[in-house]
Amino acid sequence: MYKVVLLRHGESIWNMENRFTGWTDVDLSPKGIEEAKQAGKILKEKGFTFDAAFTSVLKRAIRTLWIVLDELDLMWIPVYKSWRLNERHYGALQGLNKAETAKKYGEEQVKLWRRSAEVRPPALTKDDPRYPGNDPRYADLSEDEIPLTENLIDTINRVIPYWESTIAPTIKSGKRVIIAAHGNSLRGLVKYLDNLSNEEIMELNIPTGIPLVYELDENLKPIRHYYLADEEELKKKQQEVAEQGKARA
């Protein structure tokens, strides 16, 4: 049996401000730093250790991983960063407040933009300063690989090749792996691992800073999964994620 730990980054400054973030490179909030520390502490308490770590090229995930590895005294292990683990690209919504957007377009539309597997938010244009092609960290990507917007399927289509080519072989080689990434890149991976339908994935909310453990068989098919959190805390944090896209009076 293999184990892999999935961890959504701690609360970011834009999570705190309830903004669509996507590929915008915002840092952790003070609460997010504390969430990452707590994640590291609970992993240590439960006896977890790691031989390799994977994360995105966005600092909220990278810093979460650093903090966790620091708590575990594992800052020396190899860390592999890939744009393929980035958050889903939210197109022209990036930077907008989710509740204000829900007020303007309706909660149902915003839920589709946030949670649907197939609906894409309005796209960026290439002359928009937010276009990732202007960012040196994506200099090696072809123009086709740089998104102007993404739905969850698009996100899955970049996450899963990286899982299959790089992460899965690392796990199969016997290395203990942690993946620190984002709400939607992890939802995409969970959809793939658990073979969830497009309808089922709409209702899945992954909270910030709570380790999610997958136990996998020899073919890396899930045996079971569980969060390292008590039921009450988990439900509260999942509900907070679900509420983000609702209009406020």
From Swiss-Prot:
Extract the SMART domains matched here. Answer: PGAM
| Protein's name according to its UniProt entry | 2,3-bisphosphoglycerate-dependent phosphoglycerate mutase
Keywords recorded for this protein, A-Z = Gluconeogenesis, Glycolysis, Isomerase
Database matches in SUPFAM superfamilies? Phosphoglycerate mutase-like
Role this protein plays? Catalyzes the interconversion of 2-phosphoglycerate and 3-phosphoglycerate.
Fetch the InterPro entries from UniProt.
His_Pase_superF_clade-1, His_PPase_superfam, PG/BPGM_mutase_AS, Phosphogly_mut1
* The organism of origin for this protein: Caldanaerobacter subterraneus subsp. tengcongensis (strain DSM 15242 / JCM 11007 / NBRC 100824 / MB4)
- Designated gene of the protein: gpmA
Residues where substrate binds: 8-15, 21-22, 60, 87-90, 98, 114-115, 183-184
* A matching Pfam family: His_Phos_1
- A single GO BP: glycolytic process
Could you confirm whether the keyword Isomerase appears in this record? yes
| A molecular function GO annotation | phosphoglycerate mutase activity
To which pathway does this protein belong? Carbohydrate degradation; glycolysis; pyruvate from D-glyceraldehyde 3-phosphate: step 3/5
Which family does the entry's similarity section mention?
Answer: Belongs to the phosphoglycerate mutase family. BPG-dependent PGAM subfamily.
Q: What is its EC number?
A: 5.4.2.11
Q: Which reaction does it catalyse?
A: (2R)-2-phosphoglycerate = (2R)-3-phosphoglycerate
Instruction: Report the enzyme's class at the first EC level.
Output: isomerase
Catalytic residue positions? H9 (tele-phosphohistidine intermediate), E87 (proton donor/acceptor)
Q: Where is this site: Transition state stabilizer?
A: H182
Determine if Isomerase is one of this entry's keywords.
yes
